[in-house]
Amino acid sequence: EFVAAFQERILNTHPSLLPAFGGSMHAVAQALEHGVKVTGCTIHLVTDQVDGGPILLQQCVEVFPDDDVETLHARIREHEHRLLPLAVRAFAEGRVRVEGRCARVIAS
């Protein structure tokens, strides 16, 4: 009910480049298990589909050969912490345009 009441007005962070490894609390572990060379983070709008809302911002993060879940997740979090305020600001300033499943952030 909460999500339905605020459809596409809630921001979420996810520790992968959605749609890869979406819907999981273990996205970083899955990235390592699959041997991806690049993962990252996504800031997206929340919809009734888990991790399926329009994507606002993404940032790539290189996966190093000696990474484990903790080291990789720490680097991803740094980017999430940088991107989330940018997304909140764009949203608050009315610079987010949603068309279907696609979102654009208009430059300030």
Regions found by a protein language model. Name each.
Residues 1-105:
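Donor/substrate-binding cores of folate-linked one-carbon enzymes
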